[in-house]
């Protein structure tokens, strides 16, 4: 993945740029910086969800994204949340659910799961897509310490076993360190990477 962003503005106000970032499969980076600096906007540009920017974006790798709030199919079971959007087989999906501690919950709907379970389901779905690069937008925020530690461990294990790269948005440098991600700080106005 290569991004050469010249500028991103909201109306007349420039918020990002210039920013150059290259991340390949197996490489891990963390985007750090204060609230409102543009970390999520930058991640949305990388994901292709925000196309209103000046510059170029080349993404030959398959991407998967885990948002801060779980984005699940509420009318589908946990198993279907993995198989439908990703094309994973039922066996692959069941194995991933077991890997994230959701064995026996294959038939549960998202509303029947705790927030921590929903986040683990989101993580399993991202890996069911077999990404070359995983994009994560503050996925560990507002979790209790034990759940956060479990999610960090699961993420590290899945990254190691899949060989996927990582672009993590976080406020916490310790999360970046736990995942072996090279910290990059977004700062300034307009924000640039340092």
Model-based region annotation:
Residues 128-132:
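A short, proline-enriched helix->beta-strand linker immediately N-terminal to the Walker B motif
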Residues 163-169:
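Conserved H-loop
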Residues 123:
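Hydrophobic anchor residue at the start of the ABC signature
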Residues 145-147:
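Helix N-cap at the start of a conserved alpha-helix in ABC-type nucleotide-binding domains
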Residues 134-138:
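Catalytic Walker B motif of ABC-type/P-loop ATPase nucleotide-binding domains
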Residues 47:
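Helix-to-loop junction immediately C-terminal to a conserved catalytic motif
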Residues 109-113, 117:
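Conserved ABC ATPase signature
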């Amino acid at each position: 993945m290569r991004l050469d962003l010249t500028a991103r503005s909201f109306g007349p106000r420039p918020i990002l740029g210039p920013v150059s970032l290259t991340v390949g499969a197996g490489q891990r980076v963390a985007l750090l910086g204060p609230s409102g600096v543009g970390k999520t906007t930058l991640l949305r540009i990388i994901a292709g969800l925000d196309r209103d920017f000046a510059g170029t974006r080349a993404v030959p790798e398959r991407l998967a994204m885990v948002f801060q709030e779980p984005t699940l199919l509420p009318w589908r079971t946990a198993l279907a949340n993995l198989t439908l959007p990703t094309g994973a087989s039922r066996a692959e999906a069941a194995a991933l659910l077991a890997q994230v501690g959701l064995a026996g919950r294959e038939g549960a709907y998202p509303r029947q799961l705790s927030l921590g379970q929903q986040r683990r389901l989101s993580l399993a779905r991202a890996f069911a897509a077999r990404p070359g690069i995983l994009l994560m937008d503050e996925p560990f925020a507002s979790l209790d310490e034990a759940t956060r530690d479990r999610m960090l461990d699961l993420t590290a294990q899945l990254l190691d076993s899949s060989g996927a790269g990582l672009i993590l948005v976080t406020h916490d440098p310790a999360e970046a360190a736990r995942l072996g991600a090279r910290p990059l700080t977004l700062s300034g106005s307009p924000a640039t990477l340092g």
